């Protein structure tokens, strides 16, 4: 099932991809954590100190954007660190 399908079904879904933004030097990836059930997404984010106003409502897939140390900590606690490590292994090919 794709990330968009999982989000649409009201599941907490993770999607990590390459991302570079000059505002966040040193960050090469972002993890989108989405869920169409906004209350569920807010409750999920609260346990990690994420504020409801940080939810990105762009397109039809509400989500938090995780990056940097916060991304690594949350991905570790959620048992999803493999998504992040995949990109770290490939970073030498991105030069």
Would you name each region that the model predicts?
Residues 7-8, 31, 42, 46, ...:
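Intrinsically disordered, low-complexity proline/glycine-rich segments
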Residues 27-30, 58-60:
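Short, contiguous strand/loop micro-motifs
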Residues 1-21:
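Charged, low-complexity intrinsically disordered tails and linkers
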Residues 31-37:
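Short, surface-exposed ligand-recognition loops at beta-strand->loop->(often short) alpha-helix junctions
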Residues 14-25, 49-57:
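Short, flexible, solvent-exposed loop/turn segments with mixed acidic/basic and small polar residues
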Residues 39-40, 70:
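Short Gly/charged-rich anion-binding patches and loops
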Residues 46-95:
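Short, compact, well-ordered microdomains
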Residues 13-14, 32, 63-65:
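Ordered hydrophobic segments in well-structured contexts
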């Amino acid at each position: 099932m794709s990330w968009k399908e999982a989000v649409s079904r009201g599941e907490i879904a993770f999607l990590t991809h390459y991302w570079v933004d000059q505002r966040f030097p040193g960050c090469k990836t972002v993890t989108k954590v989405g869920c169409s059930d906004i209350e569920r997404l807010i409750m999920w984010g609260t346990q990690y100190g994420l504020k409801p106003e940080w939810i990105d409502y762009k397109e039809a897939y509400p989500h938090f954007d995780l990056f940097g140390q916060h991304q690594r900590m949350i991905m570790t606690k959620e048992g999803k660190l493999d998504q992040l490590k995949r990109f770290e292994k490939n970073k030498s090919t991105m030069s």
